[in-house]
Amino acid sequence: MRTRTEIVSTTQTSATWRDYFQLCKPRVVLLMLLTAIVGMCLASPGIVSWRVFLFGNLGIALAASSAAAINHLLEHHLDKLMRRTYRRPIVQGKINRKNAAIFAAILCILSMIILIAFVNLLTALLTFITLIGYAGFYTLYLKHATPQNIVIGGLAGAAPPLLGWVAVTGHIDPPALILLLIIFLWTPPHFWALAIHRIDDYAKANIPMLPNTHGIIYTKINILLYTLLLTAISFLPFVIMTSGWIYFSSVCLLNLGFLYWAIRLLTSQRKEIPMRTFQYSIWYLMLLFTALLVDHYVYLALKLY
């Protein structure tokens, strides 16, 4: 019987638009766009200009998709070893590496043209730095160099709300940095929970994730510590009056949920808990940024009436 790797290496099929769409990691990009949109809306005292909203999000989405495609391209040899990633289009032979590289380059160029022409130069520059940071520094070096890869590399993934803010204002302000910091602190418990669930995959691919290098208990303790730190920092938008009581009450509930899962992860040996913690973390970030958005426009509406 042939192994999965042998089956993957001999499979050759033609690419469809769905394969290129998968190359872009659309679910990840959608979550990033949500945070970028919130950054835009919080930066605006009213309704965001349609021009900035449309072209800003389009440019950010194209850059994020380009970074995702580059990640697929550079890690195809590792993806075939991992259960979570072995069905990706390059691994399956649906898209060859040359076409993937061309596709990623086109997305990157289009992103820069759109952001420079229709938004502002600073947004384009920060977006490009983020792309290079993730696709280059993180994927090529950091991911394989240290178990703190997620912590350091998380800065690139945390950038979208800052990019959205700068798209509206043209400059960097403290509230935007707080939004970035929230995602930055959310990233380690999010990915380490997945890394515990997929510990065997990362071992096969020889990627030094924290559970593989320091053990599962050490990782669970770090997840709880980062969750506590995230809990504290998540109140800053309320403290500096960027948001109001709707956000405050929402984030209280969300933090209680995250702390519950972090503590349960630490105290339980059940195999499904790491994945359930990972899944909750996604809902946490989505709902936190949604609460910021709802809070902003409810209080804006109250001021008008």
Swiss-Prot record:
Annotated membrane topology: Multi-pass membrane protein
UniProt organism field: Coxiella burnetii (strain RSA 493 / Nine Mile phase I)
GO cellular component terms, A-Z: plasma membrane
Pfam families membership: UbiA
Gene3D superfamilies attached to this UniProt entry: UbiA prenyltransferase (1.10.357.140)
Protein name: Protoheme IX farnesyltransferase
Disulfides per UniProt: none
Keywords attached to this entry: Cell inner membrane, Cell membrane, Heme biosynthesis, Membrane, Transferase, Transmembrane, Transmembrane helix
Reactions catalysed: heme b + (2E,6E)-farnesyl diphosphate + H2O = Fe(II)-heme o + diphosphate
InterPro entries linked: Protohaem_IX_farnesylTrfase, UbiA_prenyltransferase, UbiA_prenylTrfase_CS, UbiA_sf
Further comment found in the protein's record: Carbon 2 of the heme B porphyrin ring is defined according to the Fischer nomenclature.
Top EC category: transferase
PROSITE patterns: UBIA
Protein's job: Converts heme B (protoheme IX) to heme O by substitution of the vinyl group on carbon 2 of heme B porphyrin ring with a hydroxyethyl farnesyl side group.
Enzyme Commission code(s) on record: 2.5.1.141
Family statement drawn from the similarity comment of this UniProt entry: Belongs to the UbiA prenyltransferase family. Protoheme IX farnesyltransferase subfamily.
Location in or out of the cell: Cell inner membrane
Pathway of action: Porphyrin-containing compound metabolism; heme O biosynthesis; heme O from protoheme: step 1/1
GO biological process: heme biosynthetic process; heme O biosynthetic process
